Each structure stands twice: as structure tokens, then as C-alpha cells.
Regions:
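Conserved phosphate-binding/catalytic region of the ribokinase-like
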Residues: 87, 142-190
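Structural alpha-helical scaffold elements that stabilize or flank donor/cofactor-binding regions
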Residues: 58-59, 119-120, 153
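Conserved N-terminal subdomain of the carbohydrate kinase-like
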Residues: 1-68
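Conserved beta-alpha-beta core of the PfkB/ribokinase-like small-molecule kinase fold
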Residues: 70-150, 166-169
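Acidic, amphipathic alpha-helical patches
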Residues: 55-56, 117, 187
Length: 190
């Protein structure tokens, strides 16, 4: 995997090898309408074994952005490492981007989802979520979806991108709301 990335000129400087661990695998399938489904194989995988000590090797002054998704919040140990990375990124004045990207089957306890996701907003500049994710998270907090969106902005997030399948995407900011249609495409691969 590392050699393949390097062949395509992808930096592997922060690719850590964790002894006696496996690589997570996801099989993505497309149905006849282009809708994706996922099968995850994630037992004793390196992504779950990353620790705050690994973060000490990051040269924050050479980076501009930290991007993450909720797959790094699915259990306590990796969630703690993620929050440590978020704190380091903010302390080093880096842009933090969060694609919520909920994959429910990865969570050990579904009751932790909203709490772990919401705990990250205070460190984020940009949040992206889908309409389905918004509906799920707002239900968990017994808020209307618009109120939940406002609660994200109230944490200091500057932009919230809301996607809704083929419907126009919406960008929320404290001062404006923008709707933008996406071009119609034929999904071949993801």
C-alpha cells in the first residue's frame, strides 16, 4: 500500500506502521441508481491503534489543514487521539475540516455517535454532512434540523456544507446561506 501511494506521488511521511496490526478494508458497491453501500473489515486495524504519541512526529508548521471524519471517533481510544490531533491543529492555527461521514456499522455504541461528533465541532472551521446525517444527529438531540445546524455554527464553525443526494447542496454561514446545484453525472466508481 505504501509503495503504491509513493508511485502516485502521495506523501507517506505520516504513514505509521503499527506492529501486529492489519489494514482496514472497505468494499464499496454501487446499485443500479449509483447509490453506494459499504462492507467494512476493521478488526485490530492500525487506524484504531493510532495514539497521541504518533502525533508528536507531525511537523505542524509544514501543514495547512487537518481533515478527518467520524470513522476516527468510533471507539474511546481513537476518539481521544482524534481530539488530541484537533487540539494540536487548532493550537498551531491550522484549518480543520470535518466530513461527518457516518458509517453506523463501525460504531461500538450508537449512543456515542452524536456526543463524539458534537465534541469535535468546537475545533472545526468547516463541517460537511449529508441530509441523512443531519436528520439522525438532530433526532439524537431532539432538535429540529435547522436548530441543530445553528448549534454547529454556534460552536465557532465558519462553514457548514449540507449535501442532499441529487438535490442542491447548501452552505451555511452566520451571515448567509447559499444553495448550489451539482451537475448530473453517471457514477462509475467512488
Amino acid at each position: 500500500l505504501s509503495k503504491s501511494l509513493e508511485q502516485y506521488k502521495v506523501s507517506t511521511e505520516y504513514l505509521f506502521t503499527i506492529k501486529d496490526s492489519q489494514t482496514a478494508v472497505v468494499i464499496v458497491s454501487l446499485d443500479e441508481t449509483g447509490e453506494r453501500s459499504f462492507n467494512f473489515y476493521r478488526h485490530n486495524t492500525a487506524d484504531l491503534l493510532l495514539t497521541s504519541e504518533h502525533l508528536n512526529h507531525i511537523k505542524w508548521d509544514e501543514l495547512s489543514t487537518l481533515h478527518f471524519c467520524s470513522n476516527t471517533l468510533t471507539n474511546l481510544a481513537i476518539a481521544n487521539t482524534t481530539v488530541s490531533a484537533l487540539k494540536l491543529a487548532k493550537n498551531n492555527h491550522k484549518l480543520v475540516s470535518f466530513d461527518v461521514n457516518l458509517r453506523y456499522s463501525l460504531w461500538q455504541n450508537s449512543n456515542d455517535i452524536e456526543h463524539n461528533v458534537h465534541a469535535c465541532y468546537a475545533y472545526c472551521d468547516i463541517v460537511k454532512l449529508s441530509r441523512d446525517e443531519l436528520n439522525f444527529l438532530s433526532e439524537q438531540t431532539q432538535q429540529a434540523p435547522d436548530d441543530y445546524l445553528q448549534s454547529i455554527l454556534d460552536t465557532g464553525v465558519k462553514l457548514v456544507f449540507l449535501t442532499d443526494g441529487p438535490a442542491p447542496a447548501t452552505v451555511y454561514h452566520k451571515a448567509f446561506i447559499l444553495n448550489e446545484s451539482a451537475p448530473i453525472i453517471n457514477a462509475v466508481d467512488t
